[in-house]
Structure formats: structure tokens, C-alpha cells
């Protein structure tokens, strides 16, 4: 699917006239496209604000009152993550939710304090884990246990993850990995890793599902995941910086329903509490007694952004209409397999065993041996890292060429381009054109190299 480009947004250095033509957008892993109904949905809430102002909290002129605005979203979102309604909440943003969950679920002791996650994790996750160690007066160098890929490999092997857990089971407090790794595009074996770690009852297992939610089928409840969190602006298409979500397994819902003088504090799971997690029947009584709603809703803190919530709801209705993630995954696999096929046909594709750091081209760093190892995203690594006589990396030159020629993908330093065909709006033609322009970009680089050598 192409998206029109406004002429004022086209760089002056554009080769050829792209203005007014279509762009091939394979960047849903970074920001999903806006659903057609979203503008009308947002306008309806703006009208309610204009016409009713504060009264829309309880007497919305056309739709759900704002005091309950997030509640209709939960039944749409729960099937996407494979949770029960009471295990899911719409709230905050991804890192805010991760920090909130760590407050509740990271309970270190002198002997059991380590946090396990992958090397080269998304930086925001690293910062959250690092600061949890510091908050509990642990040395991050001893508290953080990162798992690296084997030498000359680009993704983690499940057996290596399990080995680290087994060897450190007496000192691990938390395992928290990404459902899909943001850089490599690797889809982790969530069920297998979770069940293995839970052989050791005191280990908590959480997942950052930023790149997995809305991308691949999830069954968090059945898999026994303790907690998970995600954003919604990638494959869930809710808009830039939009509201996130979290999952808390029902096995943790036994916490006391009251927190005050009359409660056994040992039954209460501490959290970053706020009035939106309180008993909604007493929320506006302004009592100095916290009675958290049972389940994930009890972890909410503040009233959510109405505009964010309705943007998410607009997109989730599309997922429901087309049979959910399981159904969309069938098309997604076809698109991504076609992408892999086209990349492997490229004259610049260098399989791992034949690749050279000095040879112009790319290799696929996403595990592609089995469809259970990847989602929509395929990551390619460009070589060589820098061209002689050029001030830019090879990846930057190729990325900019593709953008000038109407392909929107994204790049990650130092040398990776991520390509993600999304089943809700991408086509096989999008994929074909994207790889064709990638090849043209590398042709252009090759000509530049020859010109430099001849001078």
C-alpha cells in the first residue's frame, strides 16, 4: 500500500519527482499507519469536550463517558495478548508500565537479586533494570545478568538462555526478555522460556512485548507469564506516543482488596498506586483508604488520555473485524516469507558462511530457519560498515537512497535496516518494490566505489 507524500515534506535533494506520488511504507515496526476511522473518532471526543466539557466524564453526548473510557478497550485487547479481561489494563506508556511492574514484581533479597535480560536490549529497558538495581542498593555489575549471542551469531539461542537460568537459578529474581528483539527481529520462545524458569518457583518471568503485540499470536495466560507490558503505536496503530498496556496473570490477583489499618500487609502486593486503580464506586469519595480493583485494573494510576484510548480502540476494532492476530499472522507469514525470498535473490545478499565485512552487500540477521523465530520484521546488516572516501556509513547511504526513492523503512545504528511488511496494509507489490529499490541503492554505491577507485 502506498501513502501519498506531500510536496512540502520532500527533501530538496530528492532524485526525481517524488512529490504527489506514492511511498512504500514498510515501517509498521516503528509506527503503524493511522486507521481510516481514527480521525472521526478523535473528532467526536473533541466535539464532546467542546460541547459538554467536564460533564463528558459522566454524561458523554454520544459515546462512552470518559470516566470509563478505557473499559470497552480491554475486551478488544485481551484476545490479542491471550489474557483474560481481568488480566489486562490500558494505561501509561511502555517504560512507565515496565517501571511500575518492576516495583511490584522485582523483590530482591541478599541471595536472590539478579535480573536476566539480553545483551543489547532496547536502551529504555536497560535503564529501567539498572535503576531497579540501584534503588535496591545493589551493584548493577553484579545485579544485571545479560545474555549474549554466540561469537559470529546475531541472535540468541534458546538453549543458551535456559542454561543461564539453570546455572544461576539460586540468585535470579527476575527474567525479563523481549517477545521480539527490537534490533534483530528475533521472536523468542516465550512459552518454553517461561515454563523453564518457573521450575524455580521464586523466579518471576516478565516480557516486554513492544514488537510482539499485534504482530504475532500470544497466549500469556496459558503460558503462565507473570507480567508483560507493551506500547500500542507499532502494530496496534494507535498513534505516536500513544497509550500502553500491561498484563498481570490472575495468579497474582489474590492481593488484599483493602490497604489500610484493617488489612494484613503481607497479602497486599505493593505497586505504584493511584486513584484510578481504586474501587471505582468509592473513587470520588476521596477516602484515605486504598481499595484496589482486583486484577490488572487495580494497577492503574491516573485517568487515561481520552484521545489516546479512542485511537487505540479504533484500531483494535479492525483486528476484531479481520479475525484477530491469529488470522492476520497467516498473511503476515506470507508477506515476510516473500520478503525473505526476494532478499535472498538479491545479488548483494551474502549468506552468513559466505559474508565478508569488506564485501558490499547485506546479510539477514533475523533468524529465518523457522517461521516460529520471526514476526513481520526482517533486519538486514549492511557491509562494509564504511566506504573509503565517504563520510557516511554504507547503511546511511543506502537508507537515504531508499527514502529518496519512495521507500520508508527504518535504520538502527550502526549498520542495520529494518523492514516490516504489515498484513493490515502492506502488499506483495510493496515488498517487491522495496527490495528492488534496495538493490538499486546498492548498485549506486557500487558505481561510486568504482569511480573512487578509478580516480
UniProtKB/Swiss-Prot annotation:
- EC annotation from Swiss-Prot or TrEMBL: 3.7.1.3
Tagged with keyword Hydrolase? yes
Gene3D superfamilies recorded: Aspartate Aminotransferase, domain 1, Type I PLP-dependent aspartate aminotransferase-like (Major domain)
Q: Which InterPro entries match?
A: Kynureninase, PyrdxlP-dep_Trfase, PyrdxlP-dep_Trfase_major, PyrdxlP-dep_Trfase_small
Q: What is its main location?
A: cytoplasm
Q: Quote the catalytic activity from the record.
A: L-kynurenine + H2O = anthranilate + L-alanine + H(+); 3-hydroxy-L-kynurenine + H2O = 3-hydroxyanthranilate + L-alanine + H(+)
Q: Which GO terms describe its molecular function?
A: kynureninase activity; pyridoxal phosphate binding
- Protein purpose: Catalyzes the cleavage of L-kynurenine (L-Kyn) and L-3-hydroxykynurenine (L-3OHKyn) into anthranilic acid (AA) and 3-hydroxyanthranilic acid (3-OHAA), respectively.
- What's this protein's name? Kynureninase
Species, as recorded: Vanderwaltozyma polyspora (strain ATCC 22028 / DSM 70294 / BCRC 21397 / CBS 2163 / NBRC 10782 / NRRL Y-8283 / UCD 57-17) (Kluyveromyces polysporus)
The taxonomic lineage of its organism, from the top, reads: Eukaryota, Fungi, Dikarya, Ascomycota, Saccharomycotina
